[in-house]
């Protein structure tokens, strides 16, 4: 916390280390993922339990494509998107299929979905 206090007292910006750094040619929009029911912890992990932030998931194309091909495995109710305590139900695939339909999630795997 000392660097934060020092920054506040001196009005000097903190020096940040980027943890999640996608290649420049990858387009990623947080808002569409949130709107479609992808929870923060799905990609970022249990950040509330990380003493220092680290990259939980590879964020490599194969990892992203798995979710795009099988969103029913990962979506959750919109009111649970920001919950760090959310646990998928035992019948996640059933619930996920319903949410995919309700949220009108398309299984977008075209290159141009992410590469622009």
Predicted regions and their residues:
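Membrane-embedded segments
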Residues: 1-15, 21, 46
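Short, solvent-exposed interaction modules
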Residues: 16-26, 30-31
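Sequence context surrounding c-type heme c attachment/ligation sites in exported
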Residues: 29-116
């Amino acid at each position: 916390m000392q660097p934060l206090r020092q920054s506040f007292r001196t009005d000097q910006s903190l020096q940040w280390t980027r943890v999640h750094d996608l290649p420049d040619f990858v387009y990623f929009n947080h808002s569409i993922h949130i709107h479609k029911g992808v929870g923060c912890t799905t990609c970022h992990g249990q950040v509330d339990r990380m003493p220092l932030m680290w990259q939980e998931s590879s964020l490599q194309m194969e990892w992203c494509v798995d979710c795009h091909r099988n969103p029913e495995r990962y979506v959750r109710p919109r009111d649970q998107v920001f919950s760090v305590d959310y646990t998928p139900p035992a019948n996640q695939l059933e619930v996920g299929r319903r949410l995919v339909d309700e949220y009108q999630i398309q299984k977008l795997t075209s290159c141009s979905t992410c590469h622009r």
